[in-house]
Amino acid sequence: MDYRVLLYYKYVTIDDPETFAAEHLKFCKEHHLKGRILVSTEGINGTLSGTKEDTDKYIEHMHADSRFADLTFKIDEAESHAFKKMHVRPRREIVALDLEEDINPREITGKYYSPKEFKAALEDENTVILDARNDYEYDLGHFRGAIRPDITRFRDLPEWVRNNKEQLDGKNIVTYCTGGIRCEKFSGWLVKEGFENVGQLHGGIATYGKDPETKGLYWDGKMYVFDERISVDVNQIDKTVIGKEHFDGTPCERYINCANPECNKQILVSEENEEKYLGACSYDCAKHERNRYVARHHISNEEWQRRLNNFKDVPEHTHA
């Protein structure tokens, strides 16, 4: 594999995010990198892809800046670019929690758990493992026994916690996310809310899966990633498929976006059922006048109507 995907973040003061973003974008484009980087006065949050040579130059460039001299990169091998374009954008936050009173993870955050310590927490009956990701991420893969918050946006997690305090009160709480950045701020919020014994998986699932001792043990399914790959393996010991196909409930790890551009819901669908149900999550979405699957495959009106009849077999998916 000639390409690599880098995942990283750091909470550090960046005085002029706009200027930094413009200069950073120029460097990335000059080195043929593609990805998404968010920059704020509170730090940087990025994931990008490129050849080994170009990503090495990027790592060297970042480490040469005193603000990022100790920056840790999580690295995956890849067969090609994992992104189509390169974006570097200034933002108010590098991960959107949208709290009324913002949390500074450099001042307040949960205890860091190493992969080995997190594995022990997974085995501890007195510890609650809380997934800090979205529901569709959890549904593709998660740590065994972890709590699944019913959210589609990270900013909704605090409200979910307040509505489900009985699951957490009086317990040791350890939270986890993809690379660790969401938990930095979220675990700090839990501490500020008065929860005691709050921890977080340092480096996230990505680090746990590559750890030579834990080897991703107790992870079921795949890890959702926000790039062209969609998902990656974590458990090196005992691989399982836990995702369920949207229409027939069979094991599935293939995510698509609903073909209705006004819905765009992410659903697990086999190639066969994507074709059968016109790339949509429901009858309402399949018959939408701007169905992207219909347009992309140049499906005739007659064939469109024929496939819409397939929804008679799945009445529970009449509406989005």
Swiss-Prot record:
Q: Has keyword tRNA processing? A: yes
Q: Which residues form the active site?
A: 177
Record-linked Gene3D superfamilies: 3.30.70.100, Rhodanese-like domain (3.40.250.10)
An individual GO BP term = tRNA modification
| Any GO MF annotation of the entry | oxidoreductase activity, acting on paired donors, with incorporation or reduction of molecular oxygen
Q: Where is the Rhodanese domain?
A: 123-217
Keywords (A to Z) from UniProt: Oxidoreductase, tRNA processing
Domain of life (superkingdom): Bacteria
- What is catalysed by this protein? uridine(34) in tRNA + AH2 + O2 = 5-hydroxyuridine(34) in tRNA + A + H2O
Membership in a protein family: Belongs to the TrhO family.
Function comment: Catalyzes oxygen-dependent 5-hydroxyuridine (ho5U) modification at position 34 in tRNAs.
Entry protein name: tRNA uridine(34) hydroxylase
